[in-house]
């Protein structure tokens, strides 16, 4: 059994379950599905790393049961010496509480670990059942950072990650273990005594989450993340204070690099729907291929040039996701098959050992007490059978270690990389939504400008008509009626032609149309501020037209300011998200190489251990013959 994985659970139960702890420490089958899970005294205390960032070496495999037994004794003593961190009763209730303050501070006298660059590392050193300040039980994780201990619950890790996602929308936030469903909490709530494997897995992944966050400068410098690692801050109070409470509901309504400081214009920006992402490629191609008649459609050259890089990264990540998903399925399948093989080894060892014991029991006492017992053929056969069974036992234990490494070195890191890729796509989608927001503003501006142009043209035409009517008043009284009739005919023709041209100019490529009829031009309405798409221009008075023109100019001014802000946001998103995507790309490449090398070393060590064991058994049998 891997002590490093279940160390926290042993420590939690040491004060109340010393007998059980001692039994588990000497049992290599604990945590397996084998029938004989309580009979062979050994351990794999050095089989796995303390955390995911320091996987085991090939020398960690046990060479003999004696080595395993000594490791078991060492582990038991370590467990008793560290039981002071212990958590209280193991019959703890579950985890589905609201976020509680689990913070505690303690100065650590021992040296805090550092990496090769001298940077102080962060580590989760314990996990188990704790009591909060209100006396409730919860599963807590003890974080060691800067010589302080901070206890945080899983729900607090979850809320931290959600907050970081909103505070840093252009940064890929490292993943954490998935949250269990509410149904599972109802039927089988997490318990420190019964779910030690789940807790230890979360402990490793949360440790990886914190380490990855510290390696990302934007996250490590964030005030919320710093408060999370500060034992003096109550996490519940952090979530109900600035900057969390002043974040916008949607990051598209705030500056991407400083969402807590939006401008007044950010609040009136349009929000494109997520369903519009399906048409992103076609909209982008249309934008760069169709020559726009308006200068507002021109994006900065930097945005146009960077788009090909983002497309390449997205295609690369899609390919990574496809390969990793298939690889993860194969890993789980191979792990299951290898576990079956390990079970066969255990059964073979049990059969050989039982057979040797059976012959030993049925042997007459006279043969046992004989001085020439060493030369007795029956005793030699029993010894050979026992050595063979012992070899199968050792191979079984080594195989169980390798299965655990399948999880710690291969399956869990690969699954984490898959979550990294999913988070990368969210950042890419945020960038796409910002461009779609730009396209909405662009369309609104073009519509407003078209309306303003039509309204201005009509105003100019009506002024010409009024001037023509004014000139007719200087005619003599005798010709006044004829001149008036002629002018009215001219007015009707001019209005009809104007109506056609206005209708054609406003309906081409836009939803709203402007119509002019043959009714009186000075018709007054009871709603002078009614939208132009609901009220025909012919019904507007001169004052109403002037008001509409003024309103359109104001709207256009705001929309153009919004467009400038949107373009500025796009530039910031491109720069920040590109750096984050490249950081993730490098992290994935390095992690995959590290995973393959470590697992190859572990598999090679397992093969060597098996070969060494069989050679030793053969040598002992040959010497006895």
From Swiss-Prot:
Residues 98-235 form the PX domain. The keyword Zinc does not apply. Keywords: Coiled coil, Endosome, Lipid-binding, Membrane, Protein transport, Transport. It is a peripheral membrane protein. The keyword Glycosyltransferase does not apply. One of its GO terms (molecular function) is phosphatidylinositol binding. Residues 1-90 are annotated as: Disordered. Gene3D superfamilies: Phox-like domain (3.30.1520.10). GO terms for cellular component: cytoplasmic side of endosome membrane; cytosol; endosome; phagophore assembly site. Residues 437-469, 539-563 form a coiled coil. A 1,2-diacyl-sn-glycero-3-phospho-(1D-myo-inositol-3-phosphate) binds at residues 153, 155, 179, 202. It is found in: Prevacuolar compartment; Endosome; Endosome membrane. Present with 450 molecules/cell in log phase SD medium. Belongs to the sorting nexin family. Binds to SNX4. The PX domain binds to phosphatidylinositol 3-phosphate which is necessary for peripheral membrane localization to the punctate structures. Involved in proper sorting of the v-SNARE protein SNC1. This is Sorting nexin-41. It comes from Saccharomyces cerevisiae (strain ATCC 204508 / S288c). The gene is SNX41.
């Amino acid at each position: 059994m891997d002590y490093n994985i279940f160390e926290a659970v042993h420590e939690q139960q040491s004060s109340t379950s010393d007998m059980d702890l001692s039994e588990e420490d000497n049992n290599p089958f604990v945590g397996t599905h084998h029938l004989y899970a309580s009979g062979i005294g050994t351990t794999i205390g050095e089989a796995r790393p303390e955390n995911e960032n320091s996987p085991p070496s090939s020398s960690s495999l046990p060479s003999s049961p004696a080595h395993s037994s000594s490791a078991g004794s060492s582990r038991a003593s370590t467990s008793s010496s560290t039981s002071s961190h212990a958590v209280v009763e193991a019959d703890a209730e579950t985890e589905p509480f609201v976020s509680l303050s689990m913070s505690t501070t303690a100065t650590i006298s021992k040296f805090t670990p550092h990496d090769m660059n001298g940077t102080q590392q962060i580590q989760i050193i314990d996990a188990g059942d704790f009591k909060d300040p209100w006396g409730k039980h919860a599963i807590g994780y003890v974080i060691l950072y800067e010589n302080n201990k901070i206890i945080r619950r899983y729900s607090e890790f979850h809320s931290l990650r959600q907050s970081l996602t909103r505070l840093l929308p252009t940064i890929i936030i490292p993943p954490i273990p998935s949250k269990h469903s509410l149904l599972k909490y109802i039927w089988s709530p997490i318990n420190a005594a019964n779910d030690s494997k789940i807790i230890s897995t979360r402990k490793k992944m949360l440790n990886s989450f914190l380490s990855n966050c510290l390696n990302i400068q934007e996250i490590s410098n964030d005030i919320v993340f710093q408060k999370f690692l500060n034992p003096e801050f109550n996490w519940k109070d952090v979530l109900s204070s600035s900057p969390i409470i002043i974040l916008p509901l949607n990051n598209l309504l705030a500056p991407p690099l400083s969402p807590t400081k939006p401008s007044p214009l950010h609040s009136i920006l349009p929000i494109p729907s997520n369903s519009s992402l399906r048409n992103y490629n076609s909209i982008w191609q249309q934008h760069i291929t169709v020559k726009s008649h308006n200068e507002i459609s021109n994006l900065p050259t930097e945005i146009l040039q960077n788009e090909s890089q983002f497309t390449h990264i997205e295609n690369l990540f899609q390919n990574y996701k496809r390969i990793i998903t298939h690889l993860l399925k194969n890993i789980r399948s191979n792990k299951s098959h290898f576990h079956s093989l390990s079970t066969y080894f255990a059964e073979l060892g049990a059969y050989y050992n039982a057979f040797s014991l059976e012959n030993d029991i049925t042997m007459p006492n006279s043969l046992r007490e004989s001085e020439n017992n060493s030369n007795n053929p029956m005793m030699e056969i029993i010894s050979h059978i026992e050595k063979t069974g012992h070899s199968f036992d050792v191979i079984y234990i080594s195989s169980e270690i390798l299965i655990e490494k399948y999880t710690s070195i291969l399956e869990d890191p690969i699954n984490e990389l898959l979550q990294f890729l999913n988070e990368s796509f969210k950042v890419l989608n945020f960038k796409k939504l910002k461009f779609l927001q730009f396209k909405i503003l662009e369309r609104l501006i073009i519509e407003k400008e078209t309306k303003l142009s039509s309204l201005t043209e009509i105003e100019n035409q009506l002024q010409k008509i009024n001037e023509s009517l004014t000139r007719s008043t200087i005619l003599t009284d005798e010709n006044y009626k004829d001149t008036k009739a002629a002018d009215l005919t001219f007015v009707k023709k001019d209005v009809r032609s104007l109506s056609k041209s206005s209708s054609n100019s406003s309906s081409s490529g836009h939803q709203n149309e402007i119509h002019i009829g043959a009714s009186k031009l000075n018709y007054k309405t009871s709603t002078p501020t009614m939208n132009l798409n609901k009220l025909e221009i012919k019904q507007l008075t001169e004052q109403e037209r002037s008001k509409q023109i003024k309103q359109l100019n104001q709207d256009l001014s705001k929309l153009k300011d919004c467009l400038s802000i949107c373009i500025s946001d796009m530039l910031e998103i491109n720069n920040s998200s590109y750096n984050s995507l490249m950081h993730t790309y490098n992290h994935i490449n390095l992690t995959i190489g590290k995973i393959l090398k470590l697992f190859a070393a572990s598999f090679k060590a397992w093969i060597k251990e098996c070969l060494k064991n069989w050679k030793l058994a053969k040598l002992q049998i040959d010497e006895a013959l």
